[in-house]
């Protein structure tokens, strides 16, 4: 592949290989960098997956927002579908949590607000992401959010892009309506998933325990049981709870978070968090128990990908891949 060209960008070196695609660093003739995602040869023969890959490209190439990764073009290389995307450096929030990264409260407030801007933009043009989760929220070297991966996005203006018989999304972050019928969700599913994601970020605890619960039990809990938010700081708990309503029509419009004006519940429960930081995992050097390690490993099976500069490109944890890639 080295030396091949697509849309004026020449492939220079491989960044990584994942379950679905390989990713290359590329430059054009004025040395502008790009990342080129190329679907694996075997999957390039699967029409359902090629359609999904094309869906991502067709949606993202239309998007123009500072908090969403830019797609320059798409086409094919040696018969394999390829997407030419903005080259990013930084890390996604899942990778940061795995590294035991401590987040400032100011950072989390900023990232929530930037996600609000990004999602309000996509929703305003009829696009529902349907897979909001930590690994799809990339933080660049300037500390800003870049929303990734519209591979299972729904375009309300041009069809759903949903394949019959598929389960779309990453289970532990799904909304109740997404569990019930992924083809009928609207923008409010993203509100729920974003709130679940921030519960995870703020508490360091995965929303559901895959070690003690079956997939069915997790889905049943999503539909029928309130998410445990007891570990949240008071201001965030009051702010996020409305977005976690089981009935989509009860969720409010996405709003920016302001720690000064955020409502505070009456409960006087003392927070385990200090005033400046939120601990995402135990600090480096602390030993996890074997049960905790097993829990993290099983939870990771719900949302797993290879880590590299462009790890988001190689995320292969979608349920639809399991459905059609057998």
Tell me the role of every PLM-derived stretch:
Residues 78-92, 96:
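Conserved short submotifs of the Hanks-type protein kinase catalytic core
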């Amino acid at each position: 592949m080295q030396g091949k060209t697509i849309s004026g960008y020449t492939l220079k070196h491989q960044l990584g290989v994942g379950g679905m695609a390989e990713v290359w660093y590329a430059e054009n003739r004025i040395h502008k960098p790009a990342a080129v995602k190329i679907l694996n040869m075997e999957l390039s023969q699967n029409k359902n997956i090629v359609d999904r890959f094309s869906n991502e490209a067709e949606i993202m190439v239309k998007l123009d927002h500072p908090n969403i990764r830019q797609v320059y073009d798409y086409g094919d290389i040696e018969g394999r579908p390829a997407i030419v995307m903005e080259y990013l450096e930084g890390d996604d929030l899942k990778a940061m949590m795995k590294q035991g990264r401590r987040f400032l409260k100011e950072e989390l407030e900023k990232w929530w607000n930037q996600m609000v801007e990004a999602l309000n933009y996509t929703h305003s043009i009829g696009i529902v992401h349907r897979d909001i989760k930590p690994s799809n929220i990339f933080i660049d070297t300037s500390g800003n959010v870049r929303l990734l991966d519209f591979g299972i996005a729904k375009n309300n203006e041009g069809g759903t892009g949903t394949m019959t018989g598929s389960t779309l999304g990453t289970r532990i972050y799904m909304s109740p309506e997404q569990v019930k019928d992924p083809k009928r969700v609207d923008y409010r599913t993203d509100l729920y998933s974003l709130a679940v994601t921030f519960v995870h970020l703020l508490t360091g605890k995965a929303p559901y325990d895959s070690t003690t619960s079956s997939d069915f039990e997790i889905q049943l809990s999503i539909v029928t049981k309130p998410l445990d938010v007891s570990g949240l700081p008071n201001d965030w708990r009051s702010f996020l709870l409305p977005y976690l309503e089981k009935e989509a029509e009860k969720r409010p419009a996405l709003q920016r978070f302001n720690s000064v004006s955020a409502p505070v519940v009456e409960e006087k429960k003392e927070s385990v968090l200090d005033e400046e930081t939120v601990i995402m995992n135990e600090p480096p050097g602390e030993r996890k128990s074997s049960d905790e390690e097993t829990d993290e490993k099983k939870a990771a099976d719900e949302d797993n990908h290879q880590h590299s500069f462009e790890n988001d490109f190689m995320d292969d944890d979608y349920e639809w891949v399991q459905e059609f890639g057998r």
